[in-house]
Amino acid sequence: TGEKTEYLAGDMEDAQQSLSDYPTLIYDGPFSDHIMSAQPKMTSGAKEISKENALDAAAAFLGCDKKEISFLSEESGNVPAYCFSHNNKTVAVTKNSGYVIYMLDSSFAGEAKLKTADALKKASEFLSSHGYADMKESYYSTSDGVCTVNYAYKKDGVIYYPDLIKVGVNLETGDIASFDAKGYIMNHTERNLSSDILPQAEAQKSVSGLLTVLELRSV
């Protein structure tokens, strides 16, 4: 099946790279190169939860009874997690704080029945329903019947590209096929932006004359 990548609002990022011991979704360009060795900002120093509490978090995320979920294993590394399974889905919950770090549905995606616009809407609604309201779409990639949408955190008009979340939508069924919040958990924190921001006119002067500026934004 061919792969198609579309960039939303002109964002230029690479698509797809396999991360060892982690579900393959979309490569995050320069933001992912350091992820495997950095300390997660959202969980570092936080209290470790029990496996039972992690099970509750997994059940709430999947919207099912926790009795239907099976424990799989524990993940180590810079973001230790408890892994569970439910039908064709695997979900991992961080040992510290109890955030769902990823979910992957291995169900086969057949012939696409959903339009891309509808898939983007479903992905955004899914994020909002799980407490991620301030997220901005940057691009999407369609491969093997799944549309995976990349989001970055946005606040007060500023887009924080390191705070990444990816959501995959099965284009046949409309179900959520994947969720990857590792970039967000690794990088998200409250920030105090400097008032010394480069003026747009000055920023444009630094752009090569061979390029055409299409849009200006704070990042």
What is the predicted role of each segment?
Residues T1-V219:
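Long, terminal "pre-/pro-" and other extracytoplasmic accessory regions
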